[in-house]
């Protein structure tokens, strides 16, 4: 039996049964949030400002430059921000430069841009006083994708391609029905592929055939193509984009160029360029083929014709790409380049990089030639042009006076591509025709698509028909990436800045430079709005699930495919939702919601990280070959899903000796997601841990490997619903992740520096760190650098205030987002030494720094009088008496006083409430606000408030009378804050905010008062309980202790569960847990049994034997009522059970009198509206079946929507009269009104009276004898 005792922090200790040789530490679990936001603040904001800078006015006179940005300090702390219902933010300012392009005059100033919400150290945002989390979004990466489908009509595989940017127009290629290839730009109508190729700059049919090779597909496409030149092709493409509109070729070319080659409209981002280069590399397709021509470099043959292109040959070619780079399109024909008439300077062959004027530049007023044709463009020439700018053609000025004039011509290049001619052998050994492979220029680094990329993507598309290249799996994690908080925020900033840029341009055009300053030109309202909308209402900005630390942590590590730019829930198919083999170690295959979001919302695996491109990577241990031996090193390598495909990866459970050598010569391993048996010398990497495949919540389920997947899913999800208990206890049977989960969640307090605890109480902990300098007090040396540092010295330093102590304020009785209690308790003692990173105070649902969601209770799997039928739970009254499952809940109630309309007076907080007795206001203080500590029940007044009834302007004498007598009953009505239906408890605290005190309140609000009521909820029948294996149930009976079964030693069972809940559910983990739990409890230890690497059956048997428990884990139980033993031995053990947030107190509801819906006049539904129970169609059938006619009529009329009838019945009951007959239900009247709306005249004639009953109403006298009964 192999185990080791492991300490978790300073306080917790467990017997660890894991078998892993190299234990790799978990990464910081919320780093995905914090690191991304830090990058955005440090570099992202400045990058965005640089992108929009400079902003030019429409007439080009003014230019606005954004320089570096800066952030102020937050105004309030995180706690203070929550109390005041504000945003935890810092003011973002930027240094701005406004330049007059004519005179060169510059004005600089610092401009406030927006309030930027800041991330707290625990990875959350505080918006309007509530903590929120921004969930990461998983989206399709930009890149080039190829797919195939079988056309059943012609029994042939058709390919299609998509060139997808991060932002901008899509390019698509596809095969039509008659073996004709088509292209589409920006989802427009399709054009023949050859038309699209011509538009790129290929002049003749011969050029195209020579470049891409001859094939029947290309020939068929030419027959469909009606264009004969690039100009015609561009015009045709433009007309498809603009629904048949016709323009000259230059205008069409410029329009398409702006769509594809303008960085502001088309953005591949860093990830898109990375994917383009990887996918469109000529060598990636060429591997495994044979060269059709010699590759010649500097006059020598680098690689000879007919060479088989193995990995080694490919590496040689990769280092000498110049040997097969060729220009396909000249710079004059390249679609990417600006049209010739817009290019006013050019390079000359003899002039190197110097620019020369293409035409004379003339002063339009005087006719003087300022720059002659072919004159070099020097700084003196540019200065002369600036002086005469008002006398020169505007187009000329804009061209020459832009700062990148020298770049403009250098960007006018031909299209360079990397080209190889190859051939392959088919299955019969026959040699194929020569296949032309064109790859993109691997030196390309621009963030928009280049013509060489488009040419390469077309070549790849055609190569697929030749059997070269691979189609893509869009669900593979190599093709899906994460947008983290930094990128999501950057996108919102970009939208806000783009709108602000438009406003600024408009303002600049109407502003005289003499009056212009950066401050009055800039209007950043759109930016403020974009950020506010994102944090307030985006699908990815979620109200934080703060019910327990695990729920917090899981939400921060959640990955959603929904939201802007993602997938719509109702359009998502099975493939997107399904588990993919590339999820291994990246996304948890188990933790996902049940219901419509299944598979669209996932959770990051325990060890997963995110790379610079947004791809999820997971760690592996490097495996090396030492001669004939294969050993696993301690070196950790992180691989993305794409990179992993090159490796053969052994399972973490592979047997090894103590030196890390594989014991067996054949090993189970994965390659490309497929599991097989490989020779040990083929292995290149190994999983770091068995738990790397699952998420944090899933990895906290012991014996996960023995549970059915759907039950494990429920177990992982239900742990997040655990209510923090009054006395939390960490599990006896844990998995070892409890400590890290609690530590990284942000719920506990962690020491920043090492030192001695010199002061501790319930509200704060003070730690005195070891000084870095010698400390003296007068002539006495208190501490000498390098000398001894103990508690005595630390205490003196603290008392004399000689060093800067670390003070940690603990959160006391704070309300969470889910109305549960947040309370931090110190777990260190005065005089104790703590290291940096140690947990020094527990939070909710933690014990000694470990996650503690529930309690360890004695469980028996047995039935008891049928009370645990259908998963119901029977519980001992002992658990109620000893507050084992008691939790504290805090409700917040708020009231405001406002100024009313003119002459209506204002609302007041007061103790003098009209028509209310002294008993009702006995707990209010002199202001009229409840005193903390008071016990209140529903209907009690919390804050006395009166509101003026109507318009009045009291005379001076009336004011005097009011002042003396204080009689407010006549003019004021009671609008006090009362405890609502179902509320009550002890008033825990009161917060008072007032404009007079300088508090920030909404417009029109004078005072704001919040009352917090705490309530202790003991567990009761109807509450939901669960284990960690998806074994959930509702408490059906709480039995007195004396009726509960007991063991031979007198131990009473705490909970009885139904044994029938186990076999069909296949969650056997709970059975193993109870046996290990009771064994560990008897031995006085706690156990860590990690998932897939925990206690084996043999080890469990040995532990049970050590604890003196029968091998089958069963024992004789005695009936508490009779003292007789039960006929059969019963499985009894210790299980970790949690109380879930689905409590009966929140759900049970009864209606006496309540509101009715406006149109149908039927009772409202739901607890929140104090609604009734719907008597539905099936319930009506039940009354039909019994023939209960009168009851049925009552249900459908006076108890539902018969307005006249119910008022008459009320009158009859209060006056002791007979119950009258029902009249017409309101829903019938609604039907008649709807028919009338269609132009039909509807009457319901009473046969006896001859009256139209359908038009009777409450508001006229048509209901005889009814009005006298109205109140």
From Swiss-Prot:
Primary role: DNA-dependent RNA polymerase catalyzes the transcription of DNA into RNA using the four ribonucleoside triphosphates as substrates.
Protein family membership: Belongs to the RNA polymerase beta chain family.
Catalytic activity: RNA(n) + a ribonucleoside 5'-triphosphate = RNA(n+1) + diphosphate
InterPro entries in alphabetical order: DNA-dir_RNA_pol_bsu_ext_1_sf, DNA-dir_RNA_pol_bsu_external_1, DNA-dir_RNA_pol_su2, DNA-dir_RNAP_su2_dom, DNA-dir_RNAP_su2_hyb_sf, RNA_pol_bsu_bac, RNA_pol_bsu_CS, RNA_pol_bsu_protrusion
EC numbers on record: 2.7.7.6
Gene name for this UniProt entry: rpoB
Protein name (record): DNA-directed RNA polymerase subunit beta
Stretch forming the signal peptide: none
Species this protein is from: Acholeplasma laidlawii (strain PG-8A)
Subunit structure: The RNAP catalytic core consists of 2 alpha, 1 beta, 1 beta' and 1 omega subunit. When a sigma factor is associated with the core the holoenzyme is formed, which can initiate transcription.
Keywords: DNA-directed RNA polymerase, Nucleotidyltransferase, Transcription, Transferase
């Amino acid at each position: 039996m192999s185990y080791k005792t492991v300490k978790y922090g300073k306080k917790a200790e467990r017997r660890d049964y894991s078998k892993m040789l190299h234990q790799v530490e978990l990464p910081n679990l919320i780093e995905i949030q914090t690191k991304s936001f830090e990058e955005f603040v440090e570099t992202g904001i400045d990058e965005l400002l640089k992108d929009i800078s400079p902003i030019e006015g429409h007439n080009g006179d003014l230019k606005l430059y954004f320089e570096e940005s800066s952030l102020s300090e937050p105004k309030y702390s995180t706690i203070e921000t929550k109390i005041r219902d504000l945003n935890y933010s810092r003011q973002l300012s930027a240094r701005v430069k406004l330049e007059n392009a004519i005179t060169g005059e510059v004005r600089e100033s610092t401009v406030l841009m927006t309030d930027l919400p800041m991330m707290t150290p625990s990875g959350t945002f505080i918006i309007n006083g509530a903590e929120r989390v921004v969930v990461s979004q998983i989206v399709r990466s930009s890149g080039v994708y190829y797919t195939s489908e079988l056309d059943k009509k012609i029994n042939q595989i058709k390919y299609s391609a998509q060139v997808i940017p991060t932002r901008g127009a899509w390019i698509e290629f596809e095969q039509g029905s008659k073996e004709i290839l088509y292209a589409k730009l920006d989802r427009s109508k399709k054009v023949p592929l050859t038309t699209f190729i011509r538009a790129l700059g290929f002049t003749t049919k011969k050029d195209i055939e020579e470049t891409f090779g001859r094939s029947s597909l290309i020939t068929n496409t030419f027959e469909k193509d009606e264009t004969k030149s690039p100009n015609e092709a561009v015009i045709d493409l433009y007309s498809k984009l603009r629904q048949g509109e016709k323009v000259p070729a230059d205008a069409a070319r410029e329009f398409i160029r702006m769509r594809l080659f303008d960085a502001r409209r088309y953005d591949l981002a860093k990830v898109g360029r990375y994917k383009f280069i990887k996918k469109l590399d000529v060598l990636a397709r060429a591997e495994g083929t044979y060269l059709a021509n010699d590759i010649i470099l500097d006059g020598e043959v680098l690689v000879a014709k007919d060479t088989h292109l193995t990995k080694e040959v490919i590496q040689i070619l990769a280092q000498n790409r110049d040997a097969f780079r060729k220009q396909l399109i000249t710079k004059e024909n390249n679609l990417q380049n600006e049209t010739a008439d817009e290019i006013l300077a050019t390079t000359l062959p003899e002039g190197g990089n110097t620019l020369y004027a293409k035409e004379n530049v003339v002063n339009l007023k005087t006719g003087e030639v300022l720059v002659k044709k072919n004159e070099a463009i020097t700084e003196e020439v540019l200065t002369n042009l600036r002086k005469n700018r008002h006398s020169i053609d505007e187009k000329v000025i804009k061209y020459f006076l832009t700062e990148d004039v020298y770049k403009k011509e250098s960007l006018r290049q031909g299209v360079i591509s990397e080209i190889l001619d190859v051939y392959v052998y088919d299955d019969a050994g026959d040699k194929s025709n020569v296949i032309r492979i064109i790859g993109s220029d691997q030196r390309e680094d621009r963030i928009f698509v280049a013509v060489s990329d488009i040419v390469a993507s077309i070549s790849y598309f055609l190569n697929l028909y030749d059997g070269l290249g691979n189609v893509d799996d869009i669900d593979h994690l190599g093709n899906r990436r994460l947008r983290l908080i930094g990128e999501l925020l950057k996108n919102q900033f970009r939208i806000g800045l783009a709108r602000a840029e438009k406003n600024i341009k408009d303002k600049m055009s109407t502003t005289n430079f003499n009056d212009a300053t950066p401050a009055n030109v800039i209007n950043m309202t759109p930016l403020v709005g974009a950020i506010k909308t994102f944090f307030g209402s985006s699908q990815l900005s979620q109200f934080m699930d703060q019910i327990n630390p695990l729920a917090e942590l899981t939400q921060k590590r959640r990955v959603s495919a929904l939201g802007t730019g993602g997938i719509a829930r109702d359009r998502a198919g099975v493939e997107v939702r399904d588990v993919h083999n590339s999820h291994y170690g990246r996304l948890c295959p188990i933790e996902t919601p049940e219901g419509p979001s299944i598979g669209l919302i996932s959770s990051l695996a325990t060890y997963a990280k995110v790379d610079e491109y947004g791809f999820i990577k997971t760690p592996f241990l490097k495996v090396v070959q030492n001669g004939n031996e294969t050993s696993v090193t301690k070196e950790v390598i992180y691989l993305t899903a794409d990179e992993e495909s090159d490796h053969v990866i052994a399972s973490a459970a592979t047997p090894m000796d103590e030196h890390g050598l594989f014991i067996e010569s054949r090993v189970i391993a994965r390659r490309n997601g497929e599991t097989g048996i490989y020779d040990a010398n083929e292995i290149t990497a190994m999983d770091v841990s068995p738990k790397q495949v699952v998420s944090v919540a899933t990895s906290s389920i012991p014996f996960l490997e023995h549970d059915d997947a759907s039950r494990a899913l429920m177990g992982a999800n239900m742990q997040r619903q655990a209510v923090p208990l009054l006395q939390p206890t960490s599990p006896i049977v844990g998995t070892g992740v409890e400590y890290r989960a609690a530590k990284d969640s942000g719920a506990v307090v962690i020491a920043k520096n090492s030192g001695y605890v010199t002061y501790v109480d319930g509200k704060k902990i003070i730690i005195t760190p070891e000084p870095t300098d010698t400390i003296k007090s007068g002539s006495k040396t208190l501490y000498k650098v390098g000398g001894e540092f103990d508690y005595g010295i630390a205490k003196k330093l603290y008392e004399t205030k000689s060093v800067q102590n670390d003070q940690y304020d603990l959160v006391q009785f704070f309300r969470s987002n889910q109305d549960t209690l947040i309370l931090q308790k110190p777990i260190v003692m005065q005089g104790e030494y703590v290291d940096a990173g140690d947990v020094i105070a527990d939070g909710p649902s933690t014990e000694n720094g470990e996650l503690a969601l529930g309690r360890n209770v004695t469980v028996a799997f047995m039935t008891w009088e049928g009370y645990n039928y259908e998963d119901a739970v029977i519980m001992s009254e002992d658990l109620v008496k000893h507050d084992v499952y008691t939790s504290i809940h805090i409700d917040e109630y708020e009231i405001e006083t406002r100024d009313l309309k003119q002459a209506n007076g204002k609302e007041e907080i007061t103790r003098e409430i009209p028509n209310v007795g002294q008993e009702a206001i006995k707990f209010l203080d002199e202001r009229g606000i409840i005193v903390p500590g008071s016990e209140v029940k529903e209907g009690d007044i919390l804050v006395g408030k009166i509101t003026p009834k109507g318009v009045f302007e009291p005379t001076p004498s009336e004011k005097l009378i009011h002042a003396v007598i204080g009689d407010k009953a006549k003019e004021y009505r009671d609008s006090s804050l009362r405890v609502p239906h179902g509320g009550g408890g002890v008033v825990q605290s009161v917060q008072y905010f007032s404009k007079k005190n300088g508090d920030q309140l909404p417009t029109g609000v004078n005072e704001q008062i919040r009352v917090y009521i705490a309530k202790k909820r003991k567990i009761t029948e109807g509450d939901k309980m669960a284990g960690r294996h998806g074994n959930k149930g509702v408490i059906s009976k709480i039995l007195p202790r004396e009726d509960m079964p007991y063991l031979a030693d007198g131990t009473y069972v705490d909970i009885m569960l139904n044994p029938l809940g186990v076999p069909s559910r296949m969650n056997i983990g709970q059975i193993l847990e109870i046996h290990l739990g009771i064994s560990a409890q008897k031995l006085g230890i706690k156990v860590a049994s990690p998932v897939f690497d925990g206690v084996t059956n043999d080890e469990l048997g040995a532990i049970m034997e050590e604890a003196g428990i029968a091998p089958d884990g069963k024992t004789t139980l005695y009936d508490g009522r009779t003292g007789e033993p039960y006929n059969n031995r019963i499985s009894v053990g210790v299980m970790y059970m949690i109380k879930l947030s689905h409590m009966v107190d929140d759900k049970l509801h009864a209606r006496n009198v309540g509101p009715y819906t406006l149109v149908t006049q039927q009772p409202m539904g739901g607890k929140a509206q104090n609604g009734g129970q719907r008597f539905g169609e099936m319930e009506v059938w039940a009354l039909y079946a019994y023939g209960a006619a009168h009851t049925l009529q009552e249900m459908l009329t006076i108890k539902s929507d018969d307005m006249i009838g119910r008022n008459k019945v009320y009158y009859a009951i209060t006056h002791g009269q007979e119950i009258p007959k029902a009249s017409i239900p309101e829903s019938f009247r609604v039907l008649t009104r709807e028919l009338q709306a269609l132009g039909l005249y509807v009457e319901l004639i009473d046969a006896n009276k001859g009256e139209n009953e359908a038009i009777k109403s409450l508001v006229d006298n048509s209901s005889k004898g009814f009005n006298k009964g109205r109140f």
